[in-house]
Amino acid sequence: MNKIVKTFQVAVFLTLGFIVTGYYLLSALNIILFLFLRDFVTISLSTDSMHGSKNPEKWDIRNLVKIGISVGAIQVVEMLILFFVGIRYLDLGNNIGVMNTFFHGDNFFFGLLTPIIVRENYFFWKSAPGRTLMVSIIGDMVVVSILSLFGFGMVAPVTLIDFVFILSYGLFMNLLVNDVFKVLLKKVGLSR
């Protein structure tokens, strides 16, 4: 389901961002960094500490896709809200490099937190992620944080205030709003 959510969210958000601004919200380097760093988390999912059921799992692929697209759609709306705030109040429209870094951080934090919420049928805190998964997520967050704040000639740095806003927004939206939304989808009959 993680793959469905991310593919939908990234494709739709970047397409809408380009249509609205005429600019790519992520540079080619941002996309390469995103894919490279996110792979560590994707690979570490195989070592997660989730316990399987006593009986063989029977997945309803149609429902998995519906849930994935629903969570992806709410993430697109949340990212569009952040886009509006960034352009309107944080003055990101004047510097393409800073805008790229801002949305790279946004996209990245949403991408890192999605496995945390979709790995569990109920609220994400019902079971702790495996050590390798958490180390991968935290390690990636540290790398992206350092790159976003300092740039090192690779990307345009964002301000500390902008960065804290991106991180706080991503944590709140994913670990609270999106997780509750996922549980509500289950309550209305959409489950794996």
Language-model features: locations:
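Membrane-embedded transport module
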Residues: 1-123, 147-151, 169
